[in-house]
Regions:
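Rossmann-like AdoMet
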Residues: 1-61, 78-115, 302, 584, ...
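Helical element adjacent to the flavin cofactor pocket in flavoenzyme catalytic cores
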Residues: 382-415, 425-430
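C-terminal catalytic lobe of FAD-dependent flavoproteins
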Residues: 512-612
């Protein structure tokens, strides 16, 4: 079995009686005992960051850091930013970390510091798993964004050089002393720091070593020493003088974006754009209302391998449970994955082996533990996902639209090559746009039954179908209809499967009453993966200002929020957290590439040469 690309945890120990954390591998402390004060005097004051935050207007300020460590720099800067920046300003904090602190140790650190720096609570709750690559989290209702790279700093910065359109406003170079961690202070890193900077970009570091000063100077920075007595003799501050070789131009995000489709995918996109300061025309067709499922589970559909698709699913799941957690329509009480359907007991054991050391977000449980968490006697164990959510889709859509920058509009005639970006999120109806015909997207109907169960589980169960608690009882289902079934067929299918699955997994008699149903139509791609990113012309080139989020199928609660962040980040000059292989799994370009080999299938049409 191919393993997921994971990173090693830091070897952490406590120095002196004041509890300053120390890296055993590098024999160096993460920060002084007066950590928050040290952050201010070394990394903020020399660059006048508080003043710059206050003058940020409605723009995004980008801070980048080498060495995430205990997250102290991030927490102090986030707290300062929220306290003094205008309400319309945003902070994008980018950090790289080769050896992240393990989850139990980070949780203990966060618990101690959250009293003074509350962002620690939110970060510890959704601390990224040890999956190599980028992770993103949002705080303070979207005003503060953390993009965290797990891996070598050189790889993380090189990826930013390739993909980020915005320049960095300020650098925090905080990767242990050069003598103890020389790889962090290579000339190649300084060159990439310069490539990601523009004239006036500042940098601060605790180190005053000549190697550090010379590296910054060779990269185009003007360097000065900062008196740090009585704490130490000097630290270093610098500003970028500019160069002809690669500093990024000033980036301007679009002032307005049109989102076609106001269901779950479109409303997620609209909210992600609005929280990044863009006005959104959210086009809602009342003739095609979104399916409002009262209780949809956020179930990751984990894969037991190290493929790009496995990484993409895990990244999507962990991001989405974090993002959805702040809305009233979401209840994060966990989900229990049981044997059933394709997820046999041996396959669940493979999944447990694959993910057991990547954090507390998943764990294998036996039948006794399963009974304890669900409140019903269980015949089998399974995989417990403690942070998984249940979402009231209709309520969530209404919540997502409640933002002053989102403006609901009725459909209008399609414009040709609009000057402002347009994002298509119309589900199965997306095939009506001529330029989307190559996407291999099909409508698949489905139905779930609403039942009342005497003595039912208190957590959602997924396996051979699902049993999900909601305010009025339970939802069970659902059918998967390539063409709509005759009336009553879906009800019989769902209830028969529900009764059989209950008998095989729950050690108690089933007493229930069917009380209703919900029908809807999913947009499903031929490979069951969503479509996220630009639309493409017949040559495979991305169409200017034309993007898409669709094909979320039965798992829109996982992929739709994640897709929204990927698209909004790119439009705001940031970057998607997907690596190139993961992006290929969700790009619509994959269909054009397959069609070049085997022709059109699954109802696909050649893409239009022009719009209209």
């Amino acid at each position: 079995m191919t393993e997921l690309a994971r990173v090693s945890s830091a070897l952490l120990e406590l120095s002196d009686g004041q509890g300053s954390p120390r890296s055993a591998a590098f024999n160096d402390i993460y920060h002084a005992a007066d950590g928050p004060a040290e952050v201010t005097r070394v990394f903020m004051a020399p660059a006048r960051l508080a003043e710059r935050f206050a003058a940020a207007g409605n723009d995004t300020m980008t801070i980048a850091e080498l060495g995430f460590g205990t997250a102290l720099n991030f927490a102090v800067l986030a707290d300062t930013f929220v306290g003094c920046a205008p309400a319309g300003a945003r902070l994008h904090f980018i950090s790289v970390e080769k050896y992240p602190i393990a989850d139990p140790e980070f949780t203990a650190i966060a618990r101690q510091r959250a009293v003074d720096l509350p962002v620690y609570d939110a970060l510890a709750k959704h601390y990224p798993a040890r999956l190599a690559g980028w992770h993103r989290r949002h705080f303070h209702a979207g005003r503060v964004t953390l993009s965290l790279y797990y891996g070598d700093a050189a790889d993380g910065l090189a990826d930013l050089v390739r993909r980020m359109a915005r320049s960095v406003d300020h650098w925090l170079l905080d990767g242990f002393a050069p003598a103890r961690n020389p790889d962090m202070w290579r000339d190649g890193l300084f060159r990439d720091i310069a490539r990601l900077s523009s004239a006036g970009t500042t940098a601060c570091t605790f180190s005053a070593a000549g190697r550090v000063r010379r590296g910054l100077e060779r990269a185009g920075f003007q360097v000065r020493k900062v008196d740090q007595r009585p704490h130490k003799r000097h630290s270093t501050a610098a500003f970028y003088k500019g160069s002809r070789k690669g500093p990024l131009p000033t980036f301007r995000a679009p002032s307005e974006v049109t989102v076609m489709g106001a269901g779950l995918a479109g409303s997620c996109v609209a909210r992600a754009l609005a929280e990044r300061g863009m006005d959104v025309r959210l086009v809602d067709d009342p003739a095609r209302p979104a399916t409002e499922i009262p209780a949809a589970t956020v179930n990751p559909r984990l894969l037991a391998d190290g493929s790009a698709q496995a990484r993409q699913r895990l990244r999507s799941y962990l991001y989405s449970i974090h993002w959805l957690d702040r809305f009233h329509a979401t209840a994060c009480h966990g989900v229990l994955q049981l044997p059933g359907g394709r997820n046999t007991a041996p396959r669940l054991e493979l999944l447990a082996a694959q993910y057991h050391d990547m954090g507390p977000w998943v764990r294998s449980v036996d039948a006794a533990t399963a009974a304890s968490v669900t409140g019903v006697p269980m015949r089998v164990g399974g995989l417990l996902l403690p942070g998984a959510c249940t979402v009231d889709i209709g309520r969530l859509i209404r919540e997502l639209r409640e933002h002053p920058r989102i403006h609901l509009r009725a459909p209008e005639p399609t414009q040709v090559e609009p000057a402002q970006p347009r994002i298509l999120c119309t589900g199965a109806a997306i095939s009506e746009f001529e330029e989307t015909g190559y996407l291999e997207l099909l409508p698949v109907w489905g139905e779930l039954q609403q039942v009342q169960i005497t003595g039912g589980p208190r957590l959602p169960l997924v396996g051979d179908g699902f049993i999900t608690p909601w305010g009025g009882g339970y939802s069970v289902g659902s059918s998967y209809e390539q063409s709509p079934w005759t009336p009553g067929r879906a009800r019989a299918f769902n209830l028969d499967r529900f009764e059989s699955w209950w008998a095989n997994t729950i050690d108690a008699p089933l007493r229930y009453e069917a009380i209703g149903r919900v029908r809807g139509c999913r947009a499903v791609t031929s490979d069951r993966s969503p479509v996220i990113g630009p639309l493409h012309d017949p040559t495979g080139a991305p169409r200017k200002n034309q993007f898409i989020s669709t094909g979320h199928g039965s798992h829109g609660t996982i992929s739709a929020p994640f897709a929204a962040d990927c698209l909004a980040a790119v439009l705001n000059g940031e970057f998607s957290v997907l690596d190139a292989e993961e992006d290929a799994c969700v790009s619509g370009l994959r269909f054009l590439q397959r069609q070049a080999r085997r022709g059109l299938r699954h109802g696909a049409r050649p893409p239009a040469e022009e719009f209209g």
